[in-house]
C-alpha cells in the first residue's frame, strides 16, 4: 500500500523545480483563469518560508506592493505554477524569515550570497 502511494506521489511531482531557499528572490509564474481566458501572472518576492514534504511541499513569497506587504503561499508541485525563476540568492541565517513582516526599508534588506569557487 505504501509503495503505491509513493509511486503516485513521484508521478505527480514536477521535475523542473529549481533549487531555492529562504532569502532568495524568486519570480513565480502562476496560471490565472479569468472567464474563459487563461494567462500567466508573475509574482516576484523574497522566499520567507519553505516546507519540504515531497508532493505536499510549499513555500511562501513576500513582496511589497504599493507600500503594503503581500504574502502568497504556493504549493511547489501545483499544476497552476508554470515556472519558478530564481533572480537573486540571499544570505540568511534562519529557515523562516517571519521577522521581515515587522521590518521595512533598509532593515528588511537581505545580503546577497556570493558564488563560491
Swiss-Prot record:
SUPFAM superfamilies: Translation proteins SH3-like domain. GO terms for biological process: translation. Keywords: Ribonucleoprotein, Ribosomal protein. GO terms for cellular component: cytosolic large ribosomal subunit. InterPro entries: Ribosomal_bL19, Ribosomal_bL19_CS, Ribosomal_bL19_sf, Translation_prot_SH3-like_sf. GO terms for molecular function: structural constituent of ribosome. Belongs to the bacterial ribosomal protein bL19 family. This protein is located at the 30S-50S ribosomal subunit interface and may play a role in the structure and function of the aminoacyl-tRNA binding site. PANTHER family: LARGE RIBOSOMAL SUBUNIT PROTEIN BL19M (PTHR15680:SF9), RIBOSOMAL PROTEIN L19 (PTHR15680). HAMAP family: Ribosomal_bL19 (MF_00402). This is Large ribosomal subunit protein bL19. It comes from Shewanella amazonensis (strain ATCC BAA-1098 / SB2B). The gene is rplS.
